[in-house]
A protein has these predicted regions:
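A cross-kingdom feature that marks ATP-driven nucleic-acid transaction machinery
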Residues: 3, 155, 161-165, 169-328
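Structural recognition of the conserved hydrophobic beta-strand(s) that form the central parallel beta-sheet
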Residues: 3-9, 30
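Conserved nucleotide-binding/hydrolysis micro-motifs of P-loop NTPases
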Residues: 9-14, 33-38, 173, 197-198, ...
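Short regulatory helix/loop adjacent to the ATP-binding pocket of P-loop NTPases
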Residues: 12-28, 40-46
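Short glycine-/acidic-enriched loop or helix-start segments at secondary-structure transitions
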Residues: 14-17, 41, 87, 202, ...
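Conserved beta-strand scaffold positions in the cores of enzyme catalytic domains, especially
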Residues: 26-30, 301-303
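A polyampholytic, Gly/Pro-enriched intrinsically disordered region
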Residues: 27, 49-54, 321-326
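Interdomain hinge/linker elements that couple catalytic modules in large macromolecular machines
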Residues: 41-230, 256
């Protein structure tokens, strides 16, 4: 096998390599993960039902909503990488599926080291879950690599973004105008292009992620606040729709805290705002303040959570599994 095929990301695709092979398993590695519709088709779930639910515009009841959220959490746990999906369809347990995902991450790291043998590019990739877990206003290169920021580190970041293994989300400094025109290149967050790989990277400090952890994830009983995991899911879904990722953050008057709206997308001359909550409970202070501040510029404001569809004043409540239909 030619050595230039032994790669895992678009770093190799840029050299016109289309079929990437995992040397040990002889598995083709497709860079782009399956979206949720493709995953449902591959696993025998009825994606068309979600379209019907969306078209109805009505709540579906707690039992059905719980079932559909569990189905979506399976997608989050497995991810959309074809090898992981194949392992799931073939009845592998989640620890075995996790090992497949670790192989894919290892291939990415091999690609990263072809560009940067020091390991800094891999460190930038590995730091993404921790950055999001801290709920920081932006991704900091210096936190990831432990060194002073410099031009070389920024070049590695752009190489990482070009590899399509990560998704950049830029702060829009003024959502009143075109999001692209107000993109702050120095203020951004990073997500992974596949949420299944994100789950594995969250627990990469252990040799394998145990079935028990996956069982708790599927039943929504992990002890940690997993809002950042659901943010990654939303980032992936928005990207699949062909849109760039934007968010907006601004200081809270008279406080050291700040407001933040997780995602913004353009709709005609206006914008739709999205706040992501793993639970759906809470005051939703940021998006309400955003609606007050930018009332003339907003088309719709959504709270995306695990709860059934509904409405709170001018805030539309929607479950995660309906997001693809909201952003078409």
């Amino acid at each position: 096998m030619s050595s230039d095929l032994e790669a895992g990301s678009l770093i190799s695709i840029k050299k016109n390599v289309k079929d990437i092979m995992i040397p040990s398993e002889e598995m083709k590695l497709e860079v782009y993960p399956m979206d949720y519709e493709e995953f449902c088709d591959a696993t025998g779930n009825n994606y068309g039902l979600l379209q019907q639910i969306y078209d109805s515009g009505a709540a579906i009841g707690q039992a059905t909503n719980r079932k559909l959220m569990r189905d979506l959490r399976i997608y989050m746990a497995v991810g959309g990488m074809p090898q992981a999906v194949e392992a799931y369809v073939n009845g592998k347990n989640f620890s075995e599926i996790d090992m497949v995902k670790r192989q894919i991450i290892s291939l990415y790291e091999e690609d990263f080291k072809k560009i940067d043998a020091s390991g800094r590019m891999s460190a930038l990739y590995h730091a993404i879950p921790a950055h999001l877990a801290k709920d920081a206003r932006k991704y900091r290169i210096t936190t990831a690599i432990g060194k002073r920021n410099n031009t070389k580190a920024e070049e590695l970041l752009y190489e990482l973004i070009d590899s399509k293994t990560v998704l950049p989300c830029y702060n829009s400094t003024n959502p009143r105008v075109n999001l692209t025109d107000t993109k702050d290149f120095d203020s951004y967050k990073l997500y992974l292009s596949d949420t299944g790989l994100f789950v594995t990277l969250m627990f990469i400090d252990r040799p394998v992620t145990e079935n028990d952890i996956y069982a708790k994830l599927l039943s929504d009983k992990l002890p940690a606040n997993l809002g950042y995991l659901y943010e990654n899911l939303v980032a992936q879904m928005i990207t699949v729709s062909g849109r760039e990722l934007y968010y907006h953050t601004w200081d809270k008057k008279g406080s050291t805290h700040y407001y933040e709206v997780d995602f913004l997308i353009s709709e005609g001359s206006k914008i739709n705002a999205f706040e992501v909550k793993s639970s759906g409970s809470g005051k939703h202070e940021s998006i309400r303040e955003f609606c007050n501040k930018f009332s003339q510029n907003i088309s719709k404001a959504y709270l995306i959570s695990q709860k059934d569809a509904g409405k709170e004043e001018n805030l539309l409540l929607e479950p995660f599994y309906l997001l693809p239909f909201l952003i078409k």
